[in-house]
Swiss-Prot record:
The chain crosses the membrane at residues 17-37, 57-77, 92-112, 200-220, 234-254. This is Phosphatidylglycerol--prolipoprotein diacylglyceryl transferase. PANTHER family: PHOSPHATIDYLGLYCEROL--PROLIPOPROTEIN DIACYLGLYCERYL TRANSFERASE, PROLIPOPROTEIN DIACYLGLYCERYL TRANSFERASE. One of its GO terms (cellular component) is plasma membrane. The lineage of its organism: Bacteria, Pseudomonadati, Pseudomonadota, Gammaproteobacteria, Methylococcales. GO terms for molecular function: phosphatidylglycerol-prolipoprotein diacylglyceryl transferase activity. The keyword Transcription does not apply. Its EC number is 2.5.1.145. Keywords: Cell inner membrane, Cell membrane, Membrane, Transferase, Transmembrane, Transmembrane helix. The gene is lgt.
Length: 262
């Protein structure tokens, strides 16, 4: 069993103002995405975007992540809590961001930005998709520091006892997701996007990869207490939301390569 590193959720304080690690991780993820995406267009011989457009796109996407993620959490995972306390939407430092809601927010943001610039939607999506895992990696580390979204009881050597989760060692499911949805998916998408794939293929691979990884980790992650398992004694809301992602990812990949061969 490993010892959980009880890190103070507050990274730094300025008098009454407290900067939480959870929010700081989102800032780090967004900043890293901006830096790497900007460097890509600067090094490209035929960039689809200018550096200034990258800055605008990342800004649009960041707004979509925060607004969509918070609304998605309220609607998908804690609707009764939202009805009881609507102000919870603004307390981001407490945790509670739903990836699937954030994804919807980013899709809307990309559509709006592409339309304003006269750029096709999947050109925007294929450009941004390889950088999304950076934010996922940072966000899951933020979950780990917060000591939330832990996994089921486990006797594996790397199991941990989390605060507020009793005295039972558990899967550090946040780190599983950080590794799979963050690091592994980042490497796969960066490699794949540099092999001149057809339009829609990068977006499709992102949806498929994230959906499969998240669906798998949900088997060892405890569901949100207010929802529990929704069917069969194991199916979670996260898995239900991943199923259309997996299906749509396969459809996009098949359509992308069918169009290329045609």
């Amino acid at each position: 069993m490993l010892t959980y590193p009880a890190i103070d959720p507050v990274a730094v304080s300025f008098g009454p103002l407290k900067v939480h690690w959870y929010g700081l991780m989102y800032v780090i993820g967004i900043a890293a995405t901006w830096i790497l995406a900007r460097r890509r267009v600067q090094r490209s011989a035929n960039p689809l975007f200018t550096p200034a457009q990258v800055e605008d796109l990342v800004f649009y996407a960041a707004i979509g992540v925060v607004v969509g993620g918070r609304l998605g959490y309220a609607l998908f995972y804690n609707f009764s809590g939202f009805l009881h306390d609507p102000a919870m939407l603004f307390r981001i430092w407490e945790g509670g961001m739903a990836f699937h809601g954030g994804l919807i927010g980013v899709l809307i943001a990309m559509y709006a930005y592409g339309r304003s610039q006269g750029i096709r939607f999947f050109d925007v999506a294929d450009f941004l998709a390889p950088y999304v895992p950076i934010g996922l990696l940072a966000g899951r580390i933020g979950n780990f520091i917060n000591g939330e979204l832990w996994g089921k009881p486990s006797d594996l050597p790397w199991a941990m006892i989390f605060p507020h989760a009793g005295d039972v060692p558990r899967h550090p499911s946040q780190l599983y997701e950080a590794f799979l949805e963050g690091l592994v998916l980042l490497i796969i998408l960066q490699w794949f996007s540099r092999r001149s794939p057809p339009r829609m293929a990068v977006s499709g691979l992102f949806l498929l990869g994230y959906g499969v990884f998240r669906f798998a980790v949900e088997f060892v992650r405890l569901p949100d207490v207010q929802l529990g398992y929704l069917a069969f004694g194991w199916l979670t809301m996260g898995q239900i939301l991943c199923l259309p992602m997996i299906l749509f990812g396969i459809v996009l990949l098949a359509a992308a390569y069918a169009r290329r061969s045609a």
